[in-house]
Amino acid sequence: MSVKWEKTGKTSGELTFEISQEEVKKGLDQAFKRVKKNLRVPGFRKGHVSRVVFDQFYGEEALYEDALNIVLPEAYAAAVKEAGIDPVGQPQITPVSMDKNKPWEMKATVSVKPEVKLGDYKGIEVPKQSTRVLVKDVDAELNKRREQNAELVLKDGKAAKGDTVTIDYTGTIDGKPFDGGSAQNYSLELGSGTFIPGFEDQLIGHKAGDDVDVVVTFPEDYGAKDLAGKEAHFATKIHEVKSKELPKLDDEFAKDVDDSVESLDELKDKIKKDLKKHKEEDAKDAIQDAAIKGAVENATIDEVPQAMIDEDVQNQLNQYLGNMQRQGIDPQTYFKLTGTTEAQLREQLAKGAAERVKTNLVLEAIVAKEKLDASADEIKQEIKDLAHDYNMDEKVVRRSLSDDMLKHDIAIRKAIDLVADKAKQVAKKATKKSTAKKSTKEDEKKADK
């Protein structure tokens, strides 16, 4: 095969290659077989036309387009391999010559991955992460659980922030009702931020039996575009006011909220361990993010092809919509309810695409330099993990992912771990504001001693 690669830019070039006469003949034969069954030629039964008759009646050139579609993918892949390039995105391939007595000549305009020159990626300084669990952290979690298990009791007085009111409301704009603007016997916790800004605040200070004219303005960025920025009046009737009655913090409470413990002390110990685990996970993520960011900043990367950015956005979009569908959410219904569009989501995903592409390029360069790979056992475990995460059969996962894809993902994770493990944690520089603060003795006590 005759192959020529000529760079036209840092990340682009033209690939000229030939498709041999032998391959062209195979493509023409396959193309004829595909069209033969539907051919109608005077004097012949449908599907019983010979190749000679076809060429006389239609001309061999009538098969060229189908034949090219058949042989081109394999020929292009072979040319890419021989040229030693790493293309991204879809090439634009144009026939230069398609003579039946000569090899077909093609020219492809191709985007390629940019060159990456690694800088320092070991020993990168990252902010030191604390995994201490303080008494106040445990207390905050206990209070959260008390809130979650609170009972609502009728209240005679005025509604306050944190109380729950049962209301009827009818909304109008310019005196006319609008879709979704009315409800009966709706339970609303004041201060929860469930309704648009200002609605809940105007119910505070009122009691059961009161009629309240709530006047609010929908935010300019409100999901329903027909309501955004408009003033609305809600005729609101308060039926009842309830306040939260928090459960007593004792052994019985502990057993009620967690059947694996027998006392409040056991619950506190368990909360400490859980918080410790979460803080360690958060610290690991923070170190990884900071270390990888440093490695990317230290690297030199040629311009990133738009094709790579477009591909990243499409992959992110596919993943986002796929997760929606796995959760039983129809994407079109989601867009309708949120007042957004797929184009807006794509635009949002595009904001971080260039940085994501650069990060992946640097990690791939580290994989190559460190000669990171994946063993057969690691690939098997990866398939098991993916099947578990997505609730799929292992065989289905295996069929949908190639070894190269699995090896790539595993090697990238190894590169992330390498950069993070070699990072140096350094104390965060104290600001005037932070040094001026005085910690209480309670906060100084570690709950994980």
Curated annotation (Swiss-Prot):
**Any Gene Ontology biological process:** 'de novo' cotranslational protein folding
Main subcellular localisation? cytoplasm
Where would you find the membrane-spanning parts of this chain? none
Q: What is an example of a GO molecular function annotated in this UniProt entry?
A: peptidyl-prolyl cis-trans isomerase activity
- Every PPIase FKBP-type domain range: 162-247
Supply the enzyme class, top level: isomerase
Q: Which UniProt keywords apply?
A: Cell cycle, Cell division, Chaperone, Cytoplasm, Isomerase, Rotamase
Give the start-end ranges of region Disordered. Answer: 427-449
Instruction: One GO cellular component term, please give it.
Output: cytoplasm
Q: Where is the composition biased (Basic residues)?
A: 427-438
Sequence ranges of Basic and acidic residues compositional bias: 439-449
Localization, UniProt:
Cytoplasm
Instruction: Report the Pfam families cross-referenced here.
Output: FKBP_C, Trigger_C, Trigger_N
Catalytic activity annotated for this protein? Answer: [protein]-peptidylproline (omega=180) = [protein]-peptidylproline (omega=0)
| EC number(s) per entry | 5.2.1.8
Q: Which family does it belong to?
A: Belongs to the FKBP-type PPIase family. Tig subfamily.
Regarding domains, what does the record say? Consists of 3 domains; the N-terminus binds the ribosome, the middle domain has PPIase activity, while the C-terminus has intrinsic chaperone activity on its own.
HAMAP family assigned to the protein according to its UniProt record, in alphabetical order: Trigger_factor_Tig
Q: What does this protein do?
A: Involved in protein export. Acts as a chaperone by maintaining the newly synthesized protein in an open conformation. Functions as a peptidyl-prolyl cis-trans isomerase.
Listed name of the protein: Trigger factor
Encoding gene (name) = tig
